[in-house]
């Protein structure tokens, strides 16, 4: 929430940098709400706002009211450098401009203004919302498997995704398949992703079904859904979800983990059961992991060829 009383463009820029680089602040989603001073909707003034009182007294004035570009520059810097595993859910509260007394000069379409400026400057936001693909349809494209890992809250997170790039060679594809290259931020569109967490004490160490487990926290494939039993070309029905799950399970095996656990809602349990081989244990969908030593042979063959 930038532009709060006592803050400044420099402090807000530091705050956003912390959210990018601090391992304790690696959230999945974020809502950015620049400070807005709103009129009270209560005629008896039972609902009061200290910030509104400070504004009327003259002891506080949002810096965006003095110069909107100060706030815009802070937001552009964050959107340009945001980690690709974060999704900006909202930017600016959905408040009618007539209800705003002060703050970002009452522009309720600030997000659109921000994107227009970034487009003119040749800047691109790397967040999931700005990169997610609507639907592949029948387009004949070959998405790239990208695996990113990062420390988060005393554990390791993996952001596994299928992304579309303009060029892609078969040799590079082979390298990706066996070694899970980490990729870069030059992607064009994200088709789907899986969030995997590796933790020394999954579930805090007191949930029996999570012992020695890797945790799949989220699986999401973009595109339109179809009725059960119907065929179609939607990206949700091209098997990307299953492929992402296989990669996540391979990573768990490399840590020597025995089980995979999915935080799955009631409506998605059948998918994990029928498509991925999971079963219900407690409140989690779990799967026993069978160790495969094929990757050792691949590495040995690769070394022999190099020699």
Predicted regions and their residues:
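Conserved C-terminal portion of the radical SAM core fold
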Residues: 1-53, 69-97, 215-216
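Glycine-rich tight-turn/loop motif centered on a GG-T
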Residues: 44, 52-65, 234
């Amino acid at each position: 929430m930038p532009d709060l009383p006592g803050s400044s463009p420099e402090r807000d820029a530091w705050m956003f940098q912390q959210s990018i680089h601090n391992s304790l602040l690696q959230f999945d989603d974020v809502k950015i709400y620049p400070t807005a001073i709103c009129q009270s909707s209560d005629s008896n003034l039972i609902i009061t706002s200290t910030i509104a009182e400070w504004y009327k007294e003259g002891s506080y004035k949002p810096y965006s009211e003095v110069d909107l570009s100060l706030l815009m520059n802070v937001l552009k810097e964050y959107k340009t450098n945001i980690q690709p595993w974060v999704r900006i859910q909202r930017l600016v509260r959905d408040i009618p401009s007539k209800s705003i007394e002060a703050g970002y000069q009452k522009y309720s379409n600030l997000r659109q203004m921000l994107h227009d400026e970034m487009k003119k400057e040749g800047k691109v936001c790397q967040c999931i919302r700005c990169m997610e693909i609507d639907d592949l349809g029948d387009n004949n494209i070959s998405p790239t498997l990208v695996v990113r890992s990062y420390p988060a809250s005393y554990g390791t997170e993996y952001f596994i995704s299928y992304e579309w790039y303009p060029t892609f060679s078969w040799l590079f594809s082979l390298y990706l398949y066996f070694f899970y290259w980490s990729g870069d931020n030059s992607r064009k569109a994200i088709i789907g992703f899986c969030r995997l967490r590796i933790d020394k004490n999954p579930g805090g160490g007191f949930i029996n079904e999570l012992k020695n487990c890797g945790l799949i926290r989220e699986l999401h494939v973009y595109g339109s859904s179809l009725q059960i039993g119907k065929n179609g070309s939607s990206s949700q029905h091209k098997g990307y979800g299953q492929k992402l799950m296989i990669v996540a399970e391979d990573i768990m095996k490399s840590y020597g983990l025995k089980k995979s656990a999915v935080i799955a809602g009631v409506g998605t349990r059948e998918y994990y059961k029928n498509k991925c081989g999971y079963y219900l244990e407690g409140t989690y969908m779990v799967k026993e992991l069978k160790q495969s030593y094929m990757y050792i042979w691949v590495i040995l063959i690769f070394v022999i060829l190099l020699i």
